[in-house]
Amino acid sequence: MKSQGAAKNEANNAAQETKPVEKIDFSKVKVEPLFEEMVDFDTFSKSDFRAVKVKACEAVKKSEKLLQFTLDDGTGIDRTILSGIHAYYEPEELVGKTLIAITNLPPRAMMGIDSCGMLLSAIHEEEGEEKLHLLMVDDHIPAGAKLY
């Protein structure tokens, strides 16, 4: 068992070895205003937010915007979700990532393909240009983990 002093020294050394946090300047970033309409808790609670792992991702033929994701949602059955984010991401850079999806939306056909859910992203404007970032979480979170 380590002495309390030795444990403190190790903690201090580990803290000194970590890289300083890079500060990001958000002063030129514009975000959409918050919704004024309230959603009751029961309605919100019906949405099933899950961690999903990207098994495959490809551009949808004849579409400039759509990417087709093949996802592991923890059920053992692949889930397909389409997302109009090709302007922001190349398909190959998303394979292996852990994303957040709403999994209990009814299927919606796009370009003849059923999309079974929605991937969550954040959108803002920076220097007059729209930016989009998929919500990605730590890869240690297993596919199918429920978010509360």
Where are the model-predicted features located?
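Phosphate-backbone binding interfaces of nucleic-acid-interacting proteins
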Residues: 1-148
